[in-house]
Regions:
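Short loop-to-alpha-helix "cap/lid" segments that border enzyme active sites
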Residues: 1-53
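Short beta-strand/turn micro-motifs composed of small residues
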Residues: 23, 181, 218
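Residue-level signal for short, function-critical loop segments
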Residues: 25, 124, 220
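Flexible, glycine-rich phosphate/dinucleotide-binding loops
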Residues: 28-30, 148, 223
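Glycine-centered flexibility sites
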Residues: 37-40, 104, 218, 224
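Glycine-rich nucleotide phosphate-binding loop and flanking beta-alpha elements
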Residues: 48-49, 124, 223
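N-terminal secretory targeting modules
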Residues: 54-213
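Catalytic nucleophile-elbow at a beta strand-turn-alpha helix junction centered on a G-D-S/GDSL motif
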Residues: 211-228
């Protein structure tokens, strides 16, 4: 019941009120409360809650921390737009609207964390009958192995606000990662989650090579989502 209305916790905090949620016994509900800053969680499973609290990741907002690649040109305004704001008056409205979908945009980072998670808020929360939610507004994580980018896993969305563990139980060593953003939706906020005490920095490798970009233009047949 308490998960039906997302905004009520923020409204309470804005009024200076503390939030206590009672009888939270499932791990999913516990995580939901933690993600939204519930002040007090009352549960019949205190050991499970303590274990979950110990396993929480340290989240890092991409804004001002990691570059966003895959744009027409390097621009920071808006951060998750494929076109810069100075182009908005000169392009068709339909084209500008499509540019707010983050298709082809990605961030790269290096970390020694044994797990990688993500918290992200999509712009529109689009839903289609013929395409899975993962294809519409999910994330795809790749890792650089022996000079090649290997697919790791997808972050499956649940709605407008999402919190997903993408990969865990890796050996504690430094790795290069690339995270692709949603295809048919935009991003309002994106945070990368790593182990407490682990390090995360922007990648210094020029991979994929951005010196001579190839621009591909076409229908859904080109990108494969709705080819039929």
């Amino acid at each position: 019941m308490f998960r039906e209305h997302i905004g009520w916790i923020k409204e309470c905090h804005d009024l200076g009120l503390k939030v206590n949620v009672w009888t939270v016994n499932s791990l999913e509900d516990m995580q939901w409360c933690i993600d939204r800053g519930v002040d007090y969680i009352t549960t019949d499973e205190p050991e499970r809650l303590q274990e979950l609290l110990r396993s929480q990741r340290s989240f890092h907002d991409v804004t001002g921390f990691l570059p966003v690649y895959g744009k027409l040109r390097d621009c920071k305004n808006p951060l998750y737009s494929r076109l810069s704001s100075d182009m908005q008056p000169t392009v068709r409205k339909a084209l500008w609207n499509l540019s707010q979908n983050t298709a082809g945009l990605y961030v790269r980072f290096r970390t020694n964390s044994t797990s990688v998670g993500a918290r992200w808020t999509v712009k529109y929360n689009n839903q289609f009958n013929h395409i899975t939610a993962t294809a519409v507004k999910g994330l795809d994580l790749y890792c650089l192995q022996d000079g090649k980018w290997q697919f790791v896993n997808s972050a499956i969305p649940t709605g407008k606000e999402n919190h997903v563990t993408i990969v865990k139980n890796m050996l504690p060593q430094e790795r290069e990662f690339m995270l692709y953003l949603p295809l048919y939706d935009g991003i309002d906020k994106l945070e990368i989650g790593i182990d407490p005490g682990a390090e995360i920095v922007a990648s210094e490798l020029n991979s994929p090579d951005r010196e001579n970009p190839i621009v591909m233009y076409g229908t859904s047949i080109l990108q494969g989502a709705s080819a039929s």
